[in-house]
Swiss-Prot record:
Pfam families linked: ParA
InterPro entries per record: Mrp-like_CS, Mrp/NBP35_ATP-bd, P-loop_NTPase, YlxH/NBP35
UniProt xrefs under SUPFAM superfamilies: P-loop containing nucleoside triphosphate hydrolases (SSF52540)
Subunit comment: Homodimer.
Alphabetic keyword roster: ATP-binding, Hydrolase, Iron, Iron-sulfur, Metal-binding, Nucleotide-binding
The protein's name: Iron-sulfur cluster carrier protein
Alphabetical list of CDD domains matching this protein: Mrp_NBP35
Function: Binds and transfers iron-sulfur (Fe-S) clusters to target apoproteins. Can hydrolyze ATP.
Organism: Methanocaldococcus jannaschii (strain ATCC 43067 / DSM 2661 / JAL-1 / JCM 10045 / NBRC 100440)
HAMAP family: Mrp_NBP35 (MF_02040)
Domain of life of the organism encoding this protein: Archaea
Amino acid sequence: MAECDGKCDTCPSKNTCPDTKKLLAQQDAKIRENMSKIKHKIVILSGKGGVGKSTVTVNLAAALNLMGKKVGVLDADIHGPNIPKMLGVENTQPMAGPAGIFPIVTKDGIKTMSIGYLLPDDKTPVIWRGPKVSGAIRQFLSDVVWGELDYLLIDTPPGTGDEQLTIMQSIPDIDGAIIVTTPEEVSVLDVKKSIMMAKMLNIPIIGIIENMSGFVCPYCNKVVDIFGRGGGEKAAKELGVEFLGRIPLDIKAREASDKGIPMVLLDCKASEEFKKIVKRIVEKVEGKKE
């Protein structure tokens, strides 16, 4: 047997090595301890890229924060970490101590952790294979000192791969998954895959959000359905899950997002819809446990 180099995640013998099993059990115990301080854990999923899932995650967090909830956002998209930019806290490094890694806190009090905070700059790619990505996610879950939170939102990459599987199998008592889609038929096909994955892993479906549902004209305020309309609601009915609502495209919202300002802080149609959706989510999640 080759000499151990301590790199368990990429070791070909990790599934049979007693040392690895012991370390994973210890890490699982730390994850359970950390997650026990968080009332509600929600995974944000999308079947394909480009549907605005990270934008939805950030604005759900900001809307929950406006309701007085203590909120954290874990950016589990290791290869495409956009949360730091969207929350306006890029170019920031987390502090670490004996207790673990302390999350970055926005000026509004939202706690956040992302691989983006650990890279030298936003141009540096993360060129990792699946096992190392899964190991990084588990380390975030075990080592980040979230403290007591009302909600932890986990922003995942698109698809149904290693990252989603690692999160859903590592976090105990996940309240559910929110699926983000756009109105086109091609996006809706992928929604079904995300929902099937969650159901196979016994993760409840909180509901579907249809993003980019209509464009708000900046001149007349009329909503134009440039990507179609109703695909998310149709998928929800077909699959027997709740349709949470539609978020329109809005130039004001896009400009704010580029500056690291969540659109829920603006006076616009998208902000109104986000607040309605978050109210439905809170009623469903908290009502379920009470």
